[in-house]
């Protein structure tokens, strides 16, 4: 936020994958970086994410066809959409979200996302080599699974867009799926094997290894809970849980879903507000059966 050319010092709030990546990138450009997190690197959302880096992520959730399907999704609740009364306070965001599902906005978004994904893929591979993490990297894609013909046909638009962007994919049917992943349920009739994708087997371990590289090259990690921010004439002041003030000439807020509440609580000028919606961060670990495993994310 508001980087001043007169200072090459920056504080990054949040030590998940985004925050640690920001810290590493700034450090590589010669900045003195302090990374602040109340629990430590890779302990919150980044501890349980999918660990997938895929060009198929160029497809945003708000895509053409969403508005037509919304009534069915609202009146036949399922895993894809559940609306709670508390979500109505975000109605303005919802309308903007739907507005940008129009094809012109969608086209701009997909081009921007694809450029970002392709750039970040190269950067992550470099960092993983520097952090001796090659053993955690899997370059064998991921599977988008469909239980029946209707679900497969419903993905036609998304598959067309991936083809337009030359994302490497293979179409699989039931017997192909079993050949590729023999331990998967036989309930799936179709799949799109997105080959233009990589994944890691332990996202939290990757974040922690990145953080170790950050410290090795002079970065500072500070454990603290950030309660408030205040804009200063020559930088920023942030306040911790003990009401102790800390000064930073430049600031990056990378607190994931907690970013919006911090910025609102800090009563900053409107240009610093972040209108956000985010997926709920549930994840569950299952005890594996001996000899049963998957070779790629599904």
Please give the residue ranges for each predicted region.
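A conserved short coil-to-beta-strand element within the FAD-binding core of flavoproteins
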Residues: 172-180, 222-236
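Short phosphate-binding/catalytic loops that engage adenosine nucleotides
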Residues: 31, 167, 219
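N-terminal Rossmann-like FAD-binding beta1-loop-alpha1 element of flavoenzymes
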Residues: 8-35
């Amino acid at each position: 936020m508001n980087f001043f050319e007169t200072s090459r010092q920056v504080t990054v709030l949040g030590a998940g994958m985004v925050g640690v990546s920001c810290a590493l990138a700034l450090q590589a450009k010669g900045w003195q970086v302090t990374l602040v997190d109340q629990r430590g690197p890779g302990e919150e959302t980044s501890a349980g994410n999918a660990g997938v880096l895929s060009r198929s992520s160029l497809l945003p959730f708000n895509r053409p066809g969403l508005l037509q399907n919304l009534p069915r999704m609202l009146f036949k609740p399922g895993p894809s959409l559940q609306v709670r009364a508390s979500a109505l306070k975000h109605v303005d965001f919802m309308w903007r979200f739907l507005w940008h599902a129009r094809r012109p906005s969608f086209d701009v978004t997909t081009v921007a996302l694809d450029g970002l994904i392709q750039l970040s893929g190269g950067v992550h591979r470099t960092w993983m080599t520097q952090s001796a993490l090659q053993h955690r990297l899997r370059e064998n894609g991921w599977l988008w699974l469909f239980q029946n013909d209707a679900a497969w046909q419903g993905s036609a638009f998304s598959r067309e867009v991936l083809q337009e962007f030359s994302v490497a994919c293979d179409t699989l049917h039931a017997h192909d799926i079993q050949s590729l992943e023999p331990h998967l349920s036989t309930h799936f009739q179709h799949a799109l094997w997105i080959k233009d994708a990589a994944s890691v087997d332990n996202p939290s371990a990757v974040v922690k290894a990145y953080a170790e590289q950050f410290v090795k090259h002079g970065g500072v990690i500070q454990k603290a809970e950030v309660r408030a921010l205040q804009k200063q004439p020559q930088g920023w002041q942030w306040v911790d849980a003990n009401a102790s003030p800390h000064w930073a000439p430049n600031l990056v807020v990378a607190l994931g879903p907690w970013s919006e509440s911090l910025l609102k609580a800090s009563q900053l000028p409107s240009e610093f507000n972040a209108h956000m919606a985010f997926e709920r961060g549930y994840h569950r670990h299952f005890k594996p059966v001996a000899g049963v495993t998957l070779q790629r994310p599904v």
